[in-house]
Amino acid sequence: MAQDERAAGGDRCPRQAHRRARPVSAPASPSPLELTASDGRTLAGLVLEAPGARGALAINGATGFRREFYLKFAGYCARRGYHALVYDYRGIGASARRPLAAEEARMSDWGRLDMPAALATLAARFAPLPLATLGHSVGGQLLGCMPNHALARAHVMVATSTGYWRRQRAPFRYLALGFWKLHGPLMLQLVGYVPQGLLWPGESLPRGVFLQWRKWCLQAVPFGPVLDEELRDSRYAEVRAPLLSLSFSDDPIATPAAVEALLASYPNAQIERRWIRPREAGVRHIGHHGFFSERHRDSLWRAALDWIDARCA
């Protein structure tokens, strides 16, 4: 079941979302929280607890983004009444093993093991509060790999799509192709991982993460069918909860074609699509990760939390 709300032509404007927002409580400070995945791997998390909380939110990040990138948004969620958890996937930031060339993490581990650990931690720590997830890019792609996805009442996807390079916007897609075919493989030969640098501004990527990500981005196969041996136990068709997809017209990665290809992998979810132009949020640019800028606190952030409120109240 899909409900299509497009930003052009009479949709709810994000700038008006503050009219429906609930009162904001006192700010929260992050506290360290160690997560333990089902395979025993520990992950570095930070939790922001909300006074008088009415729910809890797991924030599943994008590839190469550390947990600290999401702290301002998590703080806003806590002020809105949601315990918020941010964390680093295995192989990334504070959850990486050193030397990074010896790190064995794969991208599928994030969906099969790490994201479930985050949700399970919230369930154990904050029961019986309702749970939700918010996934940025790969954090939404791999929702269907989570064996415990049904613990959450609702899911928000931000700039989430397939990574297939041909669905991306030119000239970005040609830069991406160069990254997959030339830069990444060369770095693996030289140092054993893909380091942070001019051609890859994100966190350094372990070999297994890069190679699996590369494989997925060079083929058009959707996430529902088998992409990889490690995704054979995926549960995309089992996701039935409400799902909000937030996409942005100036995002060169999560284009309409790429977003729709990803959402097709969730055939039974209650999907609501919002295609947002930057001017709808009162800005010139949002792109692939601009949603998490604090300037969107009274527009995009409020709209996302209002949507979660309506499903977790």
How should each PLM-predicted stretch be described?
Residues 239, 245-247:
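Short beta-strand/loop motif that positions the catalytic acidic residue
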Residues 104-124:
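Alpha/beta-hydrolase active-site loop
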Residues 54, 62-65:
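Active-site glycine-rich loops that stabilize anionic/oxyanionic intermediates
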Residues 276-313:
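Catalytic active-site module of serine/aspartate enzymes centered on a nucleophile-bearing elbow/loop
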Residues 67-69, 74-99:
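Conserved alpha/beta-hydrolase
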Residues 134-221:
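Alpha/beta-hydrolase-fold enzymes
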Residues 255-265:
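Short alpha-helix in the alpha/beta-hydrolase fold that links the catalytic acid
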Residues 24-48:
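N-terminal cap/lid segment of alpha/beta-hydrolase-fold proteins
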